[in-house]
Regions:
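PRPP-associated nucleotide enzymes
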Residues: 1-95
Length: 95
């Protein structure tokens, strides 16, 4: 497992955390749903998190041929990352 947090400062991480709401017991009792809608509503933070994904790739010398993203959140972040890396995006849908 690669640890990524150490390459980002605490202030950056905390500013992103503040953009993610926690909704307890949704969709069922005992689940803590993480709502990323506030992050998506901000070009500043959406760009920052995408840049962080690029930094992680570069830091680990990852040179993917394409980004594969699962349905839902993968469809949001995958194409943004692929575009910044200059590669294609492959969407994967749930059965």
């Amino acid at each position: 497992m690669v640890h990524h947090m150490s390459i980002f400062d605490n202030q950056t991480i905390e500013s992103l955390r503040q953009q993610i709401r926690t909704i307890p017991n949704f969709p069922i009792e005992g689940i803590m749903f993480r709502d990323i809608t506030p992050l998506l509503n901000s070009g500043k933070y959406l760009n920052k998190v995408t840049d962080m994904f690029v930094t992680i790739c570069n830091h680990n010398n990852w040179v993917p041929d394409a980004i594969v993203g699962p349905e839902a959140r993968g469809f949001i972040f995958g194409p943004l990352l692929a575009a910044k890396l200059g590669i294609g995006f492959i969407p994967i849908r749930k059965p």
